């Protein structure tokens, strides 16, 4: 069977978690991150830098990478201009916890209103296949 014909996962369908105030959380994702949709925050995949759109599922032995986030998970969102996005978040009163640049991209972290850690990632080049 050719890879094209093989059943495969095609992307991240969603992130689902329990919060105390769903409407306030949805408003934060809409007003602060610019994500909105009929059924909640939504984003459409696009091909950037000539690569195939993708999401990564990572498993960690402990929660050190996710801290100070709560709930044992983190959401990674790709952005096209991390510096500009950080400036926009800062103007809206969002605290940026940290930012770094690695060989494969630039990263910054914030917490949503429920304490969920959000990792913002600007990819610097197409990933290796």
Where are these regions (language model features)?
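Short alpha-helical
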Residues: 23-24, 83-84, 105
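Short amphipathic alpha-helices within nucleic acid-binding modules
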Residues: 28, 83-88
């Amino acid at each position: 069977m050719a890879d094209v014909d093989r059943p495969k996962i095609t992307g991240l369908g969603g992130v689902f978690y329990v919060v105390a105030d769903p409407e306030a959380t949805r408003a934060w994702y809409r007003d602060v991150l610019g994500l909105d949709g009929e059924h909640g925050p939504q984003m459409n995949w696009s091909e950037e830098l000539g690569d195939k759109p993708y999401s990564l599922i990572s498993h960690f032995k402990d929660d050190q990478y996710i801290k100070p986030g709560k709930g044992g998970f983190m959401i990674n969102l790709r952005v096209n201009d991390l510096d500009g996005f950080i400036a926009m978040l800062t103007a809206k009163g969002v605290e940026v916890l940290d930012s770094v640049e690695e060989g494969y991209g630039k990263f910054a972290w914030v917490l949503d209103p429920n304490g969920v850690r959000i990792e913002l990632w600007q990819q610097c080049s197409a990933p290796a296949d």
